[in-house]
Design a protein with these regions (language model features):
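Hydrophobic anchor residue at the start of the ABC signature
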Residues: 138
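Catalytic Walker B motif of ABC-type/P-loop ATPase nucleotide-binding domains
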Residues: 149-153
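Conserved ABC transporter NBD signature motif
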Residues: 53, 59-73
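The feature captures the beta-strand-to-loop junction immediately N-terminal to the Walker
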Residues: 37-39
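Short, charged/small-residue-rich alpha-helical element at the C-terminal edge
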Residues: 220-289
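ABC transporter nucleotide-binding domain
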Residues: 167-251
Length: 289
């Protein structure tokens, strides 16, 4: 790994006696793209907040470029919730961020990133679609030319076309040496864009791996799905030891990629995840609730 630009050491966060982050340690090298995955409630957003100093860790240390605290002029953050002012036009928002950014992106560079139609720049931001708002919020983060990006569920609300455009921009940023840490529920995106994958589960860092290593593993997987997907299992050839209890159905497989593709084709979607429906990866277990 290249020289560490971010170092997290034994980070602990407790809230009202409950451990939210449990001794998290990892490093991110200059120019690396690191994905943080795990079910809702695993601690992804809290971890980012502690790294950025928005929340105070109970113990542990975070160093960015060897120093405590974030360098405001070098870091950009895309929050999980869009925070774009709704009563400004798109062109006005862009002009404002250009005004507060020294040597920022030009109007032409911004337009090349957004690929909006001419009339969309005249619209108020709240008139854009959810995906367009998300893309705009992301591009506004880039106007100051940060060298470190923190992105919390960056593609939430994006349609397929907008999401594809987003990852095209990410790939260009990677080529230019920008360091990126992002959280995601979209496993297919993680596999194609991340250099490393961190898996959080119940506040613990249970895996630090690479997409290649994750794909090459030939482990037996246990899959747990809501019982409403039980009829879909009849169409799956590569599963065994199927059991149904209460509101879930569980089975085993040695070909998780093929099985997951089939489930997606039958309507099982990661994008439907919420607090009660989430994707978790824990060792050899794939859990959808």
């Amino acid at each position: 790994m290249s020289e560490a630009i971010l170092q997290v050491t034994n980070l602990v966060k407790k809230i009202k006696g409950k451990t939210i982050l449990d001794h998290i340690s990892f490093e991110v090298g200059q120019g690396d793209c690191l994905a943080l995955i795990g079910p809702n409630g695993a601690g992804k957003t809290t971890l980012m907040s502690c790294i950025l100093g928005d929340k105070k860790a109970s113990s542990g240390q975070v160093l960015i470029k060897g120093k405590k605290g974030k360098a405001q002029d070098q870091i950009a953050v895309l929050l999980q919730e869009n925070t774009i002012p709704s009563q400004l036009r798109v062109k006005e928002l862009i002009a404002f961020f250009q005004d507060i950014s020294e040597n920022g992106l030009s109007k032409e560079e911004i337009q090349a990133l957004l690929q909006f139609k001419d009339d969309q720049y005249q619209q108020f931001a709240d008139k854009l679609s959810g995906g367009q708002k998300r893309l705009l919020a992301f591009v506004l983060c880039l106007i100051g030319k940060p060298d470190i990006l923190f992105l919390d569920e960056p593609t939430a609300g994006m349609d397929t076309t907008t999401r594809q455009r987003f990852w095209e921009i990410i790939n260009d940023l990677k080529k230019s040496g920008v360091t990126i840490l992002y959280s995601s529920h979209y496993i297919e995106e993680v596999e194609h864009t991340a250099d490393r994958i961190l898996v959080l589960h119940q506040g613990k860092l249970i895996r630090d791996t690479t997409p290649h290593a994750m794909r090459s593993e030939e482990k037996e997987k246990q899959v747990t799905l809501p019982s409403r997907f039980a009829p879909s299992l009849d169409k799956l050839a590569d599963i065994y030891d199927v059991t149904e209890k209460r509101d879930v159905v569980t089975f085993m497989t040695k070909d998780i990629e093929s099985v997951w593709s089939s489930l997606q084709a039958q309507g099982c979607r990661i994008s439907d995840i919420d607090n009660e429906n989430f994707l978790g990866l824990s060792g050899n277990c794939l859990l959808l609730r």
